[in-house]
Structure formats: C-alpha cells, structure tokens
Amino acid sequence: MSVLDDVTEQQFEQNFNAWLDSLSTGATPTPVLTETGTVTEVADGVAIVSGLARALADELLVFASGVHGIVLDLEPGRLGIILLGPSEQIHLGETVYRTRKVVSVPVGSALLGRVIDAMGRPRDTLGPIDAIAEHPIEAEAPSILNRTQIFRPLATGLKAIDAAIPVGLGQRELIIGDRQTGKTSIAIDTMLNQARSDVLCIYCAVGQRGDAVARVIRALKDGEMLQRCIVMSAGDEEAPGLSYIAPYAAMTMAEYFSAQGQDVLVIFDDMTHHARSYRELSLLLRRPPGREAFPGDIFYVHARLLERAGQFGADIGGGSITTLPVVETQAGNLSAYIPTNLISITDGQIYLSPQLVRKNQFPAVDLGLSVSRVGSKAQNRTLRGVSGNLRVTLSQFEELEDFARFGTRLDDVTRARLARGSAVRTALRQAERDPMSALEQLAVLIAAMEGLFDQFNEQKINDAMRLVRDAAQQQLAVIEQRIIDNQTLQDDDHTLIVNCAQKALSIFDQPATNTK
C-alpha cells in the first residue's frame, strides 16, 4: 500500500495550496546592482577613471587591487581620483567600485597614546585600536551661535609667549618662521606643558621625516604626555593623498573630544607641506594653476579646516579646539602666498626670527612681528600687568641698540637702558623641554624688569633665573593662589616678588670663601 493511498484528495489539495502560499509570501532574491568604472590613467598619487557617472564628490572608491581613493574632480565621463595608497599597485583597465561612503576615521579615547596614520590605522606595535565609532573627516564648522567668547588661557610654559603673545583655549595661533628656527620645539614644549592641565593633544605631522616624528614621540614619552596625546603621521614617502586628508582626520578626532566637553590642542606640522601636497595633486589632475602654481581654492582648503576650531557653547558639548598650525617661510618672506593666507585665516601669529636665532636667542620669538588678536582677553590678569611694560622695554631697547651700532658716545642713562634691555631679552631665553609655571614666569620677568639682572652676564642671568624660580616656588604661595584665582597683582604683591628675588640673588653678593 502506498503512502499516498492514506492521503485523501481534500488533504492533498490543502497541502498543495499551503505550499503555493508559502512560495508567494516568502523572500525572493533581488538582483544586486554594482556600479563599476575603469582606470584609464595612473600617475603618482592620482588616477583617472571612466564610468561611475553617479559618483559623488569626496566619495570613497575602492580599486580591485584594494587601494582606496577619493573623488576630487567630477567631469562628464571622467573622474579625478586622489589615491590613499601606492599608485604602483594600480594598473590600466583595473575595475573601480563605488562605496557610497565618504572617508571616515576612528574616534575615541582608545586613540590616546597611539601613533597612527591619516586613516586612523596603528603605526606602532600596540595592536589594533578598539575605537568607539568612525566619523567622516569632512564636517561643517560650528555656527556663530554655537560658539562662545574665548575666555580661558592656554599656558604654553614659555615666557615670551605667555607674557607677550598669550594664546587662549579655542584660538588659532600660527607659528611661522624659516627652517631651523624652532617652530616644532615650541609646539612640543606647549604639549609638554599641558601636563599641568587637562588639555588633550593631537600632533599631526604632514610631510615630516620619520626621524623627526620619532623625536617628537620620544619627547612626549620623556615628558609623560604621550598617554594624553595622539600622534598622526603622514610622511613624504607615503601617498600625497594621505598628507592631504591628515589635518582633516586630526580635526575630526579633536571634535569628538570637544563634544564631550574636553579641551583639545591640535598641532599641524606643517601646513606648507600640506599645501604642496594639494598643489601636486591638483597639477596632476590638470587643474588650472594660480599664484605660485597653487590651485585657486587653496585658501578655502585651509579656511574650512581651521574654522572648525574654537570655544564652543554648552549645546554642542562646551569643549574647545585650539590649533597651532605651523608654516615655513623662505628667507623670512612673510608676504608669500601660503603664509599670507594663513595669517589672514588665523587669530594671530608667533613669528620666529632668523636674526634672533643667529644671536642664540631661543625661543626666537620676534615680539614686534608677533601678535595675538584674541588671547589678551583670555590672559591671566596677574601676567597681564607685566606684558605691556615688557613690550615697551624691548622695543625701546632694540631702537637704542641699532643707534648704538654707529659708535656714538652714549650717556649713562642710555647705557643703563641698554643694559636693562639686554638683561630682559636674555631673561626671555628658555631651554627646550623646560616649561615654566605662571608663578615662575612672573617672578623672573618682574626681577628682570626691576633691573635685578642688569649687572650680570648671560651665563649669570641663566643661573639667576634658576635661583629666582626655585625661591618663587618655595616662598610665593600667596602669589600662586592669586594666579589660580585670576586676580590682578597688587603693589604689595609686586614688592613681595621683588624682595623674594633679591634675597635669592644675594648669594652673588657674598664673597667667595677661601678654602685652604
């Protein structure tokens, strides 16, 4: 007897109808549409792709070889792509795929203490990065209504800057100067000084040699600041596309922390290499060159990056992003295209003079050509009373110094003013990796302005500054509290500092003991 003999015709019909219903209501496979293009040209760092008519500007593409690229030029039947990997891996006729995404990088506290590339991939030996999320590198700058006034100082630990060219949290202050004038050293010392605060740091090296980046990492390790820093490196040996996107990636990481209410310091070292990378890519893509062969939108490229910095309101986290972009000049030419662009975008500049370098004046900050347009409002009131007299004293000294070169006979008053100015300028010298607290800066500058260093030579002034710094830390707790409370310095406080410095320097007045 067959099994079918036990199934009635009615049951069979019911089962058959149920099977048909399941087919009609079940999921049916749908075709997957994949848009592809073809590589028609390859150059160093760029590729030309045909097809992909629906690709969007700044969209991330993937080549069949695994290399990624970004759409930079959109033309009928032709896409200009900047490569984020070695162009040697790409060949003519290779297939290119759309991702319908933009370039994104990991964000979060897991990046602190790590060395990464422009895509957020680890370059150290600490293993993979467990990031919280990925954010696109391009973002709209916060509106005016989402910003607040810059009202808090960023302490660099450098006397010449904190006293005369103060920087505020949320400010964009340009560091500008020729090669080998100490631009990166100022950036490193500023990061190291944040060990006294809660500011997080991001160092973005664009076009720097590997040994230069290694020195920065070593300095941060020695200063116990690496665990609160992110070091991003996009060297000259890598694809120029990575150098182009690196500052935007660093800013995206900073925006994550500022949205959590934290203060972030971002160093772009340096924007000259960034501009050159963008010029190289633009020329290879046959974009019309402009002044100094830079493309016409180079100002916008830098402005849209730096406008993302600022002091933000509580509605978007209440944090801040302070940027210190570095730019290199040629023979002190401040009127070159990229330097003038960045000077007009930023809130001030710290100019490092080659003439001061030749005089062994480090940091070689030229106070006459340096300015902070908003930082003075955020400067500590205790230091504010010193900064005005400091600038006047140095400017008068430089005028007299030029006059004295003619060999004119000088009277006693002029010689005294020259001695005072020379002592004050020497007092502004500061060794690398030796950041000073606000109290130490105040004590040293007041001692110099009051003429306590006038009779010393350069070596003795260095020793005298160390004595004054130590004495201030031990005896001026009241003044330190005034600095913390952001109070104005009183006459009695000024006298207290002078007396403390005089007592510390009295060791130079003691006769040497004769030990036989």
Curated annotation (Swiss-Prot):
Keyword annotations of the record: ATP synthesis, ATP-binding, Cell inner membrane, Cell membrane, CF(1), Hydrogen ion transport, Ion transport, Membrane, Nucleotide-binding, Translocase, Transport
Binding residue positions for ATP: 177-184
Pfam families on file: ATP-synt_ab, ATP-synt_ab_C, ATP-synt_ab_N
Site positions for Required for activity: 370
Enzyme class: translocase
Location(s) in or outside the cell: Cell inner membrane
Keyword Glycosyltransferase on entry: no
Record protein name field: ATP synthase subunit alpha 2
Species the sequence originates in: Nitrosomonas eutropha (strain DSM 101675 / C91 / Nm57)
Gene encoding the protein: atpA2
